[in-house]
Structure formats: structure tokens, C-alpha cells
């Protein structure tokens, strides 16, 4: 085992199907007029992928283990709450967050016009820098067919 303290990197992925009648929360922002996402919490794929990447990088588990459906206190929880709790858990375990990069994958909502607001909302909730991008799958897969939304995130953590 290497005794040199190095940064650690984690990857997180989250996918949720669209669900009529639910508000749409993505990247800690509500998207009025958009169909929401199904899920135990608010279905915020960007926040969930970021949490998963951070938990993985710090060896604290994954999204399902920490905030899973067996945890009723997180039913309906916002992505911002999950990000803040993830940051708290990492800090308690001796980790500092370097940054998080998130890519939202899907046809809607269109992120471009609110990307900076989304980055700020996620960064404030996490207490660390978050960058955000978005892409489509050119009609391929569940996101291309408009069945849901996905996100992938990469996180860098260092020993505090």
C-alpha cells in the first residue's frame, strides 16, 4: 500500500425515469413546466451523481448505502440536502472536497440557459466548486427516447 497521501477520484452515475405530477429538480434548481423525475428523494440526478462520486472517492459507500430507500428520513429530500449531508460526512471522515464535475445526459430540461445558476446552487449546497455540463444521446437509449434523465459525475477529494 502506498503511504504517500494522494488525491482520490470517484465516479458517480444516477438515472431516474420521468414521472408526471412531480416537480422537476435538476442540479438543485426547480425547472417549472418540466416533468419531474421519480425517486425516493427529489430525483435530482445531478446532485445524486455528485454525492455518489464523493462517497466513492472517500470510500464512504455509495448513494444507495448512505441515502437509500431504507432511510425514511431522506424520503422527498432535496438534492441540496443530500449534497450538504455528503459534505458533512466527508468532513467528519477527514476528507476535503477539491471539486466536482457533473454532466447531465438527456433531452430536457435544457441546461444551457441556467447552467451558471445550477453550478452556483450545487456549489453553495456542497460548499465546494461544482462544474456542470450537459449533452444528449442523439436519440439513443432511455434519455434519447425521452424516458428519463441521467448524470455522471467525477469528484476529487484530498485528506484534510
Swiss-Prot record:
Transmembrane segments: none annotated. Coiled coil: none annotated. It catalyses: 4-CDP-2-C-methyl-D-erythritol 2-phosphate = 2-C-methyl-D-erythritol 2,4-cyclic diphosphate + CMP. GO terms for molecular function: 2-C-methyl-D-erythritol 2,4-cyclodiphosphate synthase activity; metal ion binding. The keyword Ribonucleoprotein does not apply. Pfam families: YgbB. The record marks 40, 136 as: Transition state stabilizer. Its EC number is 4.6.1.12. The keyword Metal-binding applies. One of its GO terms (biological process) is terpenoid biosynthetic process. It is an enzyme of class 4 (lyase). Its cofactor is a divalent metal cation. Pathway: Isoprenoid biosynthesis; isopentenyl diphosphate biosynthesis via DXP pathway; isopentenyl diphosphate from 1-deoxy-D-xylulose 5-phosphate: step 4/6. 4-CDP-2-C-methyl-D-erythritol 2-phosphate binds at residues 14-16, 40-41, 62-64, 135-138, 145. Binds 1 divalent metal cation per subunit. Homotrimer. HAMAP family: IspF (MF_00107). Involved in the biosynthesis of isopentenyl diphosphate (IPP) and dimethylallyl diphosphate (DMAPP), two major building blocks of isoprenoid compounds. Catalyzes the conversion of 4-diphosphocytidyl-2-C-methyl-D-erythritol 2-phosphate (CDP-ME2P) to 2-C-methyl-D-erythritol 2,4-cyclodiphosphate (ME-CPP) with a corresponding release of cytidine 5-monophosphate (CMP). This is 2-C-methyl-D-erythritol 2,4-cyclodiphosphate synthase. It comes from Frankia casuarinae (strain DSM 45818 / CECT 9043 / HFP020203 / CcI3). The lineage of its organism: Bacteria, Bacillati, Actinomycetota, Actinomycetes, Frankiales.
